[in-house]
């Protein structure tokens, strides 16, 4: 295993010009696969409200749900840095509540850092969380928790005033102690300027190639939803098609009685005859066979190798 990725690793990547690869994960199996593929950072995004739970926004996601999914991802990751979103209304009410909830993601969920949305108005919140020894990643531009305020999922920072505000917010978050910053749904020229002005890494999603790294929702890059086609997503696979084909083949074999076949079934160790209607024999306790003598079902389901 390569060295564990930390926030200092990510800062060093920016300094040497090595791009940061970040992707969402919501369970241990995906975490293990994505880490094996080379992920530097695994983000447990509140996007799970949409891609896992079926909501039309991230707003219904709760702290308990974020802790649950964060813990699952942390169990599947060994090398990658694990960062978890603070969900809607988990940090906006007070700094005390923000620190408590950030602490839950670290203590109960096993996250290495947390991410929150918002600009200079949350600089004090960032300071409070960092003071509690919890690293914070910021998030500017198209911030999904502010979907109603923005009037939908629309590109941010196209006008000069809005672009200047995003730059000012980025500088404020860096000053407050954020170790990295997600830039979502902003023009590539603005993302380039912000990246050049900051000493901390920027990670883009729909923000052009000049950010210090990139992040995508794993379900999007894997082609799990053919009806979701945003401009900023490139599909590297068609898992929707592959899964449909594989599951369809399974269903077809079940319906025609072809599965399970002899290869996928178990046999008794000796011939057993059970006469119809015969009374059941008295129970006889046999000595336990050595564990190695029994036929094993296979590796423990779901546990990474």
Curated annotation (Swiss-Prot):
It comes from Myxococcus xanthus (strain DK1622). Its cofactor is Mg(2+). Binds 1 Mg(2+) ion per subunit. It catalyses: 3-methyl-2-oxobutanoate + (6R)-5,10-methylene-5,6,7,8-tetrahydrofolate + H2O = 2-dehydropantoate + (6S)-5,6,7,8-tetrahydrofolate. PANTHER family: 3-METHYL-2-OXOBUTANOATE HYDROXYMETHYLTRANSFERASE (PTHR20881:SF0). GO terms for cellular component: cytoplasm. It comes from the Bacteria. 3-methyl-2-oxobutanoate binds at residues 46-47, 85, 115. CDD domains: KPHMT-like. The active site is at residue 184. Pfam families: Pantoate_transf. Belongs to the PanB family. Keywords: Cytoplasm, Magnesium, Metal-binding, Pantothenate biosynthesis, Transferase. It is found in: Cytoplasm. Catalyzes the reversible reaction in which hydroxymethyl group from 5,10-methylenetetrahydrofolate is transferred onto alpha-ketoisovalerate to form ketopantoate. Mg(2+) binds at residues 46, 85, 117. The gene is panB. GO terms for molecular function: 3-methyl-2-oxobutanoate hydroxymethyltransferase activity; magnesium ion binding. It is an enzyme of class 2 (transferase). Residues 277-305 are annotated as: Disordered. This is 3-methyl-2-oxobutanoate hydroxymethyltransferase. Pathway: Cofactor biosynthesis; (R)-pantothenate biosynthesis; (R)-pantoate from 3-methyl-2-oxobutanoate: step 1/2.
